[in-house]
């Protein structure tokens, strides 16, 4: 099991939670980005730098993730592809994507893209709140406990 992070867009406060969790869980954490990242020294944490370009990091995560892994991303298409491979997907606000919810999220994303393309201002997401950080940490812990149970 590995935790994969779409690190270019992941908030620093979420990365900090992940660094602590990787140590505590003794689980590999891979941050994939198209720029250099500073991470704490750890045998569980590593970075994977990819070339700059549209979806390059996403494609690398999809290529390498496996069933049982966890992908941290706010990118709905990346989450959908990870789920197709049997990985779990969690966004930085603590929302766990599931096979049951990902289609709805893809449809909403496409609808919002259509609105933006027609010139309608849709605004962006609110900034990450303390409640979001707590929800993320709780959902990460829940995933880890489920993963431990399934490993036997």
Swiss-Prot record:
Record-linked InterPro entries: UPF0178
Pfam families, A to Z: DUF188
Annotated transmembrane regions: none
Record-linked HAMAP family: UPF0178
PANTHER family recorded: UPF0178 PROTEIN YAII
NCBIfam families: PRK00124.1
Family membership noted in the UniProt record: Belongs to the UPF0178 family.
Protein name: UPF0178 protein YaiI
Organism: Escherichia coli O127:H6 (strain E2348/69 / EPEC)
Lineage of source species: Bacteria, Pseudomonadati, Pseudomonadota, Gammaproteobacteria, Enterobacterales
Gene name of the record: yaiI
């Amino acid at each position: 099991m590995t935790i994969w992070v779409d690190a270019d867009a992941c908030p620093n406060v979420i990365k900090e939670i992940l660094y602590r969790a990787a140590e505590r869980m003794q689980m590999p954490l891979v941050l994939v980005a198209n720029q250099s990242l500073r991470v704490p020294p750890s045998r569980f944490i590593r970075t994977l730098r990819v070339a700059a370009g549209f979806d390059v990091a996403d494609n690398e995560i999809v290529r390498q993730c496996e069933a049982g892994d966890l992908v941290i991303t706010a990118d709905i298409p990346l989450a959908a592809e990870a789920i197709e491979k049997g990985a779990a997907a969690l966004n930085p606000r603590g929302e766990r994507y599931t096979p049951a919810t990902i289609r709805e999220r893809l449809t909403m994303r496409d609808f919002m893209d259509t609105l933006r393309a027609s010139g309608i201002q849709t605004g962006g997401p609110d900034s990450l709140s303390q409640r979001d950080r707590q929800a993320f940490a709780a959902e990460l812990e829940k995933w880890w406990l489920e993963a431990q149970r399934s490993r036997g």
